Amino acid sequence: MAEGGFGADSVGRGGEKASVTRGGRWDLGSSDDESSTSTTSTDMDDLPEERKPLTGKSVKTSYIYDVPTVPTSKPWHLMHDNSLYATPRFPPRPLIRHPSEKGSIFASRLSATDDDSGDYAPMDRFAFQSPRVCGRPPLPPPNHPPPATRPADASMGDVGWADLQGLKRTPKGFLKTSTKGGSLKARGRDVGDRLRDGGFAFSPRGVKSAIGQNIKSWLGIGESSATAVPVTTQLMVPVHLIRTPVTVDYRNVYLLYLEGVMGVGKSTLVNAVCGILPQERVTSFPEPMVYWTRAFTDCYKEISHLMKSGKAGDPLTSAKIYSCQNKFSLPFRTNATAILRMMQPWNVGGGSGRGTHWCVFDRHLLSPAVVFPLMHLKHGRLSFDHFFQLLSIFRATEGDVVAILTLSSAESLRRVRARGRKNDGTVEQNYIRELAWAYHAVYCSWIMLQYITVEQMVQLCVQTTNIPEICFRSVRLAHKEETLKNLHEQSMLPMITGVLDPVRHHPVVIELCFCFFTELRKLQFIVADADKFHDDVCGLWTEIYRQILSNPAIKPRAINWPALESQSKAVNHLEETCRV
């Protein structure tokens, strides 16, 4: 065979050739009567002690694997032989540490696990229940004495299994019943239990009230027939909103957003429109008050406090207002994202001819992202940095119709006082006037965008051009110079120009202004004077309806109507369920 093959010359008799050319690790041709110098002996008796098997009979083999025949460590069930792992107590109770002990409860649980005794501790160490049916003991008798480690005040501790007998389910949660007075025997037993538990337990509501409550409970004097246990209300989680809709039915829908100062009648008009129009052709989105007041923090209460005690030029006040305005804007941004997912962006004003549908919103993202920050900026409560960060989150959709409702400041203040909201006490007439000015400034800026381009608006903000020069270069605007000057003075551009003067050379500022005016131009504004329609909601809606249908620039959008109705029902159900 050729060189490098497996011929007769390549491997000699008895492995001599292999031992000369290459010292193989496994010498399969070696024998007892041959003296080979290439491999190690495979006899089990000649192995060192550390390479012999740990147990079992030694067997001669040609291969040696360095793998022990028994495990090198103890099995899990031998390391953890505590009976707690076998049958946990049911039901679990919280672990109560002595005040003198240091360290966390988790550390105490770990130290308790190392105990080798098979007896249970007075309390369960792990808050889990046995999966076996037989692991649940029967209920204790009614007169069963409570454990010695029970909290002194039942309202301050967790509800155990023995305490569930005295609970009943109500619409407000679980209520723990307690009889007024009671028999002498029952009162004596309760006194003994509390003395055995260590006397009085002071609650964090104050020493004086705690002493009174503990004395009454020690004497067995009942104050009320039921003590409320706070339980979180179980609400439906609307995960169906993010799934692919089963029914797809695109309709022509007008997206109408009602805007204006507080007390102008936005919520009243939303409810009236849902009653005036046919139910199958209208849906609505209320003001997200539940998210503002109950999700994590109450930003509505916080902003009311800042209007009362906030200081102009204070960085802390500006940071708090920025945080509140961000939370105000989040529900509008999520709604806009959901609606954009249901929309056919290429279909404007066409599609199905089954009639026009309406979707009415209480406020637009324009309010928390532009109008209110502009008012706070004017009064110095919001810094320049925070103002432009809020301005950057503003987004709009082609076809959004913003109806600004106007009303006198005196009438608006009277309505605010009449509705009696808890956090509206800081609203004054001057505050309503400043807010109306902010709406008017944004509206004038939008009107300017109907005459000049977005690039020219940005150039006005960074002071690279002016109104006379723009009108001089355009034949169409030759006779509009005075109109544009008046609009420019009443718009938000003078304030933005003053803020951007030190940083107008920065590309970020240029791009920010360009994006903002591009989004603002997508909107369609109409103005309705609510002063002409006192106590006439139908007349006010007729005026808005007429302006929308007579404006050729306002067109409906093709939206999946079943998905939009499902989104609206989920939002309305949450507002009706959680609002007090």
Curated annotation (Swiss-Prot):
Region described as Disordered: 1-60, 133-157
Amino-acid positions noted as binding substrate in the UniProt annotation, renumbered to this chain: Q325, R421
GO MF terms, alphabetically ordered: ATP binding; thymidine kinase activity
InterPro entries per the UniProt record, alphabetical: Herpes_TK, Herpes_TK_C, P-loop_NTPase
Gene name tied to this protein: TK
GO BP terms: DNA biosynthetic process; TMP biosynthetic process
Protein name: Thymidine kinase
Annotated transmembrane regions: none
A GO cellular component entry from the record: viral tegument
